[in-house]
Design a protein with these regions (language model features):
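Membrane-embedded alpha-helical bundles that constitute the cytochrome b-like, heme-associated redox core
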Residues: 1-122
Length: 122
């Protein structure tokens, strides 16, 4: 029997909430970047670098990257599970779907780790 935690994180409602929270985070980050562009019109490279060396901006950027990655994973999972089916493709659909999802997962994990390397210098 599955635990209630597994049922919660694998439910459509939980994915919907993650999508919406991620969308809000991405929106707030875009506002933050646009605000900095408009307020500091002649911002130099060194001022941008100084801004992004702030730990809070690094954290906000990393949370935004995580939001983008979770948003992409949930969206692509929905598309792949909707269109790569036995009814549409045939008996090999399950294998093809697993290959697509595994490849997507590897790519998104690499992106997340790469963002950590860029933002935190790890």
């Amino acid at each position: 029997m599955k635990s209630s935690f597994n049922l919660l994180i694998n439910s459509g409602s939980a994915r919907w909430i993650v999508q919406r929270i991620g969308g809000v985070v991405i929106f707030l980050y875009a506002l933050f970047i646009l605000w900095n562009l408009f307020v500091n019109e002649s911002m130099s490279y060194f001022e941008w670098r100084q801004l992004f060396e702030s730990k809070i901006v690094k954290f906000f950027s990393w949370v935004t990257v995580f939001s983008l990655i979770s948003h992409a994973w949930i969206g692509m999972h929905c598309v792949i599970s909707d269109y790569i089916t036995v009814r549409l493709i045939g008996p090999k659909a399950l294998v093809i779907r697993k290959i697509f999802m595994s490849t997507l997962t590897v790519i998104l994990v690499v992106y997340f780790l790469w963002s950590a390397l860029i933002l935190w210098g790890l």
